[in-house]
Regions:
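ABC transporter nucleotide-binding domains
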Residues: 2-4, 9-203
């Protein structure tokens, strides 16, 4: 599902990521553990096609990122470490915007959104994103990705800003999606989170 060989990223003379080799299987929750500044976010950006590697190869869902990036991006989901939500949109408007991008069925998505909002105990979809706390925006971003059930899910420090109960709910949802065949790649700087939420852990 997720493969990389010799993945390297340099910014001038600075080596941000050096020779990363990954092999993540379908239905696996893979933890990528390391301290802040170790290159976790840079690695995810390369794996998801938002940052071009200096060298190395990436394969997602059996497709080469160099040649089929557009198709790959439609079949994966990404939750960045900083939720990127337009501050002038209300929560439900942001979710409708995501539906329009991916041409999702609104009736079907409404059911999934209600299920996820109930799970995360969210009752603020009529609030402007700019008025939400980091934790609120993080949950909204998670819902916007989880509602469409991507085949591969990339999560960059997903528990930051979440309380213990919400983190537990996220773990249960990820385990459910993995059982259904989805693949999860998750970064964290917390060893306990990596051990509790992952099937395997790699350290950078």
């Amino acid at each position: 599902m997720i493969r990389s060989v010799g993945l390297t990223k340099k910014f001038g003379d600075f080596i941000a990521v050096d020779n990363i080799n990954l092999n993540v299987n379908q239905g696996e929750i893979f933890g990528f553990l390391g301290p802040n500044g170790a290159g976790k976010t840079t690695t995810i950006k390369m794996l998801t096609g938002t940052l071009r590697p200096t060298s190395g190869s990436i394969e997602i869902l059996g497709m080469d990122m160099k040649n089929r990036a557009i198709e790959i991006k439609r079949r994966i989901g990404v939750v960045p470490d900083e939720p990127k939500i337009y501050e002038h949109l209300k929560g439900y408007e942001f979710l409708e915007f995501i539906m329009s991008i991916y041409k999702l069925d609104k009736a079907e998505m409404k059911v999934k959104i209600e299920e996820l909002c109930d799970a995360f105990e969210i009752d603020y979809l009529d609030k402007l994103a700019g008025e939400m706390s980091h934790g609120m925006r993080q949950k909204l971003m998670l819902i916007s990705v989880l509602m469409r059930k991507p085949e591969v899910l990339f999560l960059d420090e997903p528990t930051v800003g979440l309380d213990a109960k919400s983190a537990k709910i996220l773990k249960e949802l990820l385990m459910k999606y993995a059982r259904e065949g989805a693949t999860v790649f998750m970064t964290t700087h917390i060893l306990e989170i990596a051990e509790k939420m992952s099937d395997r852990v790699a350290i950078i």
